[in-house]
Amino acid sequence: PPIAENVIAYKTFLLDYIRKYPQDMVIPLFNDTAEFASKFKQEIEQYGCKVEIPDWEVFIKGHDKESLMEICKFLGVPHPRTANPDKMGYEEAINYVGYPCLIKPNLSAGAKGIKIIRNKADFDNYFQDITSHFGKSTIQEFIPQTGKQLKVQIYRAENGQVVASSCYEKCRYYPIDGGTRS
C-alpha cells in the first residue's frame, strides 16, 4: 500500500514481509519512507533487518527545515536567514528575513508548499493556507539561482567511512516561482 495513503497499512505490510522473507537491510529512498523508517526503526530491526537511517531523535533535527536552520545558525554554518512568524510575529520575522522570501513548510519534499512572496499581501494570501495544508512553516530568505546547482549524496558506514558518493549538476531550478502548493 502507498505510504502516503495509510502509514499503518504500510507498516503492517512491511513488517509482515520482513517476517516472511528476511532481509539484511532496508535503505529508504524517498523522504516519506525515510521518515517512516526512522520513526519505526526499532520495530523493523526486531526482525534482524538493519535500517540504514539515523534514529528519530537525530533524523528529525536534519529533516525539519526550521530545526536544521537553527542548528546551522548555532554552529555558524552559512545558511539562508530563516524565521518563524508564528513564534516571533510577522514584523520581527520579516525584518530579519526581508523580501522577497519563501514560505517553506518545515516538513515537506519536492518543493511542495514552497511559495515565493514579495510583500505583506502575498504573505497574508499564502501563509495560513500553506500552514493549514503542510503544518508548521517558516519564511526564508530567497537566494536567486545565479549559477550551477549541485546535488551531493554521501553514504557513510557507522564508523564514518565514506562507502559511496555522487555529485551532479541539476539541469534546471525547479520550480521557477519557488514552489508548488500540492
Question: Residue spans of the language-model regions?
Answer:
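Conserved N-proximal alpha/beta basic substrate-recognition cap immediately N-terminal to
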Residues: 2-81
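Short, well-ordered alpha-helical microsegments
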Residues: 34-38, 90, 123, 148-149
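Mobile, glycine- and charge-enriched loop segments
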Residues: 1-4, 84-85, 126
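ATP-grasp fold ATP-binding core
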Residues: 72, 94-116, 135-146, 165
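Glycine-rich phosphate-binding loop signature in dinucleotide/nucleotide-binding domains
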Residues: 17-23, 96-97, 132-133
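ATP-dependent carboxylate/phosphate-activation module, predominantly the ATP-grasp catalytic core
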Residues: 121, 141-182
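Short beta-strand-to-turn element immediately C-terminal to the catalytic PLP-Schiff-base lysine
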Residues: 85, 114-119, 154-157
